Amino acid sequence: MQEVKAFNEKRAEIYWWFSSLFAKELTENELETYHSVEIRSFLAGLGENESLKPAVDTLVDALNRLQDREDAQLELAADFCELFLKTEKHGALPYASMYIGKSGLLNDKPAEEMEKLMADFGMQVDENLKEPADHLAVELDFLGNMIIRSNELEQEKHMEEALEKQNEFIQQHLMTWLPQFAAKCKQFDEFGFYVSVAQLLIAFCKLDSTYLLGE
């Protein structure tokens, strides 16, 4: 159990890291940390897994190119804005409703389902984010909390049930629309930083599901 709990902490941290990248633009200081030994070592560690390596390599390449990009922070913030804050026609809006909702509008059934799931879990959307519950950053943050909450369990049977629920969440609330979202990122993200993050997220979700299913 202790090994599982230690691994859960790492999994939660990774989902929270992804969440932070889709929640808001990176500041100058945050961007600097992406060139630090700590973050590069973290990415290298992820890249040691064969299924993650191609996506990690693409992300590292984007980070290396950022170092040569003039006004890198401003340009990356502009990329974030164009992709995630503008229109569905020219961007990749990070809401499940835009991809699997019936209306093609915000706050469709996926947002309602997430709100209920969060309420059942005793959570609500962070007021600072001011986004619907099916925003990608909210869903990833929630998954991180699900994982950490399961570390309070003491019986192996209960932990197995919790891991099954985590896999269900990944399959039903993320993998149902992440591939379409990543495809739109690829279409509109010319520089390629955010599409590389989206592709790495998908690769990680698939890997995590394999782990959760005990394959």
From Swiss-Prot:
Keywords: Chaperone, Cytoplasm. It holds the Pfam family Nitrate_red_del. One of its GO terms (biological process) is protein folding. One of its GO terms (cellular component) is cytoplasm. Its main location: cytoplasm. It comes from the Bacteria. Belongs to the TorD/DmsD family. TorD subfamily. This is Chaperone protein TorD. The gene is torD. InterPro entries: Chaperone_TorD, DMSO/NO3_reduct_chaperone, HscB_C_sf, TorD-like_sf, TorD/DmsD_chaperones. It is found in: Cytoplasm. Involved in the biogenesis of TorA. Acts on TorA before the insertion of the molybdenum cofactor and, as a result, probably favors a conformation of the apoenzyme that is competent for acquiring the cofactor. It comes from Vibrio campbellii (strain ATCC BAA-1116). HAMAP family: TorD.
